[in-house]
Amino acid sequence: MAGRSVRVPRRGSAGTQSRGQLAAGRDLLAREQEYKRLNEELEAKTADLVRQAEEVIREQQEVRARPFSALTTSCKEEGGSSSRDLLSSEGTHPWTETKPKTKNTGPVNKIQNRLHSADKERKTNSSAKLKYPDAQTANDVAIPDDFSDFSLAKTISRIEGQLDEDGLPECAEDDSFCGVSKDIGTEAQIRFLKAKLHVMQEELDSVVCECSKKEDKIQDLKSKVKNLEEDCVRQQRTVTSQQSQIEKYKNLFEEANKKCDELQQQLSSVERELESKRRLQKQAASSQSATEVRLNRALEEAEKYKVELSKLRQTNKDITNEDHQKIEVLKSENKKLERQKGELMIGFKKQLKLIDILKRQKMHIEAAKMLSFSEEEFMKALEWGSS
């Protein structure tokens, strides 16, 4: 019974530990999928921003390729009053090299607003990504095929080369650059796009570094989980072996009890036989006192009875000696059984102590995990407040 009471809580603790490990593994996988999705969105936003910059250059090249009459009509339609003021201030030669007196900064502001909105979305994704400390990144991120060879330095050099070769038109058809002079539009575009791309490159490098750190942490946690699973398997094996030993000792104890019962039955039968023989002796003594008349005739029979009585006494002595020996043997066996019983009780106590120690170790491990998580969240909250 004691072995069964020990075995049941041990299985429960192993089951709860395995369920906790499975739940932790599922949580890690869900976080990994979430971070992959956020990283894909970030890469898509970056690629979209680069495509927008390339579209601006392409539209400028298309506008430059148009004839002069189409350019003037498009500037008049899109520029409105600002283009008319620019033409009136320059007189009859609106397309000369002289700079206008009033500078139109509307298209530059449009580009800045567009890039600023994209940057806001990207920062929102990166902040949502930093909220979770345990994630797999860097090596497991799915990157689009057209973005594998992306380099901000190459993109900047390509844009600068196109601007140096083609230049900006005096009046472009695009809404973002219409009404801006050639020198101001080129400088503003190059300076703004260059700064924006450098900032994005730095943010991307910081995100990749953070992803690698998180991946190292996840690998450490996986190794810890693996070690815990191996410890659990070893503990289960030891428990099963101890349970088999307990069952074996139980069987031996039952067999010893059966043997003890059999010996007790034999002892009771011998005692009954001895009592019957004693009664016979009493009857013989009474018959001797009653048969004084027949004493002479019964002398021979008395002698015979004496011989038989001596034999019976001898046999009784032998039987009593054997009974004493059997009793001593039974006592020694009972002592052995009591000793085995004491050893079993000591083993049960040791197992209970081992179970308590394992429960405490489990509680310490869980407390250490909770403490580490709380410290990391506190440090991240401090960093977030300072930023």
Curated annotation (Swiss-Prot):
<feature type="coiled-coil region">
    <location>
        <begin position="184"/>
        <end position="347"/>
    </location>
</feature>
<dbReference type="GO" id="GO:0005737">
    <property type="term" value="C:cytoplasm"/>
</dbReference>
<feature type="region of interest" description="Disordered">
    <location>
        <begin position="1"/>
        <end position="25"/>
    </location>
</feature>
<keyword id="KW-0206">Cytoskeleton</keyword>
<feature type="compositionally biased region" description="Polar residues">
    <location>
        <begin position="103"/>
        <end position="115"/>
    </location>
</feature>
<feature type="compositionally biased region" description="Polar residues">
    <location>
        <begin position="70"/>
        <end position="91"/>
    </location>
</feature>
<keyword id="KW-0175">Coiled coil</keyword>
<feature type="region of interest" description="Disordered">
    <location>
        <begin position="58"/>
        <end position="133"/>
    </location>
</feature>
<dbReference type="GO" id="GO:0034451">
    <property type="term" value="C:centriolar satellite"/>
</dbReference>
<keyword id="KW-0963">Cytoplasm</keyword>
<protein>
    <recommendedName>
        <fullName>Testis-expressed protein 9</fullName>
    </recommendedName>
</protein>
